[in-house]
Amino acid sequence: MSTSGPAAPGDVPALPPPPPGPGSGPAPPAPAATARDTMDGRAELPIFPRAGVPPLAASDTVPAVPEGAGAARPAAPPRPTSFSVLDILDPNKFNSRRRRCVLLGPVVPATCAPCAPAACVAVPAASGRSPRAELERRALSAATGVAAAAGAEPTSAGDSYRADEAEANGYSSGSGRSPTADSEDEAPEDEDEEEAPEVQDAQGTEEPRGGSGGLGARGSGCPGAAEVEASPVDDTAAPGPRGNSPGAPGPPATATGAGSAGSTPQGAAVTTKPKRKRTGSDSKSGKPRRARTAFTYEQLVALENKFKATRYLSVCERLNLALSLSLTETQVKIWFQNRRTKWKKQNPGADTSAPTGGGGGPGPGAGPGAGLPGGLSPLSPSPPMGAPLALHGPAGYPAHSPGGLVCAAQLPFLSSPAVLSPFVLGSQTYGAPAFYAPHL
């Protein structure tokens, strides 16, 4: 180095701790000759950019802009590479692409199809070199200018360190596969059985080659990297369609394996999804009829009393009864049809047009009242009916509580207000419990 007076500022890299002041960024362009001398020795190259740390932000986006006029002259012009400074600054992306291409060798285009193909094409030119030497050579070739050296050299050191760390963790080709690849290759036996035999052969040839089934795509910035990492079916068991398009994995595996590392939950999800569909189709096709109407106790009591009065309802009677019981007319009509069918089975040859009276068939509500004296006509007063209804009512209810219901059920020939008003008055006068309140 020169020790003359004008060149004293050029000795700043040799000083022990150069202060990185705010104005030290634009300072290096002045001593261009001394910078050229320091560029001749590669050993001092990492020391020089320490004084110019602020220009690092500019070097992220502008690839190689030399700060001095003679700063880029000693180095050869940069040879065209397929990556930019942003690729160097992304260690995971750069490391995974380089390692996958170096490990798999000549079959790079077929294996790296999900990634950008240009990133893997430039590597086989120097396939004879070791991964670390290739990494350092790329970093040095990209660091022709001082600004590019400031952005690339520390990152390249970190790149090589991360590559060594990845090899120590077991991600190299010799020691074995990554834990993700191990877990992916073990579990999906059931899915592999469903694949074609030639696909299984392709899988068997691909696994021993580098053992990095889920390694190359994991951590890379490719579009389909997430799908390839998450779905072992696309990564190992289906190499054929993988070369068609970058982001075109199989729909079932992508849907089920979106966020899971292992493939055991994926296999369960893949197998259970058709089961869910089959269950839904069975419930629709196997059970087309809807659920039966669940009648409450007071609705059954009122319907039975109405059936004892008459087995056939007119339109007005059916409407009034449906309104009083909070049912639809269809529900009332169907209940009466079923009740008539049951009554005909229990009383063969009986006159269906005559009112049933007190001697109705032993249905759910008419059985206990069959032997009571007197065939009760539809217009009978409610007190005589309280006794037969109390026999089949709940044990806790008093004898007069169903009597209020019978008033409305046993007066079918009155007008609509007359049918509803005895029901309301009866339930309030006789002190019916709150159990009947919703139907008032």
From Swiss-Prot:
It holds the Pfam family Homeodomain. Residues 1-82, 145-291, 342-387 are annotated as: Disordered. Disruption phenotype: Homozygous knockout mice for Sax2 exhibit growth retardation starting immediately after birth and leading to premature death within the first 3 weeks postnatal. Mice do not exhibit any obvious abnormal behavior or motor skills. All mice show normal suckling behavior, but at 2 or 3 days prior to their death, they become lethargic and show signs of wasting. The few homozygous animals surviving to adulthood are fertile, but all the offspring from homozygous intermatings die within 4 days postnatally. Residues 210-222, 356-374 have a biased composition (Gly residues). Keywords: DNA-binding, Homeobox, Nucleus. InterPro entries: HD, HD_metazoa, Homeobox_CS, Homeobox_NK-like, Homeodomain-like_sf. This is NK1 transcription factor-related protein 1. The lineage of its organism: Eukaryota, Metazoa, Chordata, Craniata, Vertebrata. Residues 288-347 bind DNA. Residues 182-198 have a biased composition (Acidic residues). Belongs to the NK-1 homeobox family. Induction: Autoregulated by a negative-feedback mechanism in the ventral midbrain and a positive-feedback mechanism in the midbrain-hindbrain boundary region and the eyes. GO terms for cellular component: nucleus.
